[in-house]
């Protein structure tokens, strides 16, 4: 009987953690959606972008959502690839300081444009606007998540 109590306790804790994870993920996706909706309205108002795909709610969600997911996957992949190069080539001057960040930014912007953006004909955003948006994301990443030591590494 003690085993059953212990098992139900672990199941309850797992469900609580899973509930917190799902709720926080839903809140994050809601804020992301509102932020991207606001960004799209700003781009339309300033005549910097045009979003001409307007079917139903779910069609729009799949079309624009896949644009965001593929863009995120591209940015994430290039970021990890650049970190891999930086780790394996520590003495290379291109992977140190501002050179590393400029190369990461340029490669990420160009790859996003040619891998994702040109295939979405209903999303018309100028290249320089994409450069500014991705540059802003890089600045936010460096401000809020600077390179730091692994605090769990005990030596």
Curated annotation (Swiss-Prot):
Q: What is this protein called?
A: Multidrug resistance efflux pump SepA
Positions of transmembrane segments? 15-35, 61-81, 98-118, 120-140
What membrane topology does the annotation report for this chain? Multi-pass membrane protein
User: What does the UniProt keyword field contain?
Assistant: Cell membrane, Membrane, Transmembrane, Transmembrane helix, Transport
Taxonomy of origin reads: Bacteria, Bacillati, Bacillota, Bacilli, Bacillales
Tell me where the signal peptide lies. none
State a GO cellular component annotated for this protein: plasma membrane
Highest taxon, organism lineage: Bacteria
Q: Which family does it belong to?
A: Belongs to the multidrug resistance efflux pump SepA family.
Q: Which InterPro entries match?
A: SepA
Tell me which species this is from.
Staphylococcus epidermidis (strain ATCC 35984 / DSM 28319 / BCRC 17069 / CCUG 31568 / BM 3577 / RP62A)
Record's function text: Involved in multidrug efflux.
Q: Where in the cell is it found?
A: Cell membrane
Q: Does the keyword Cell inner membrane apply?
A: no
Extract the coiled-coil ranges from the record.
Answer: none
Keyword field contains Cell membrane: yes
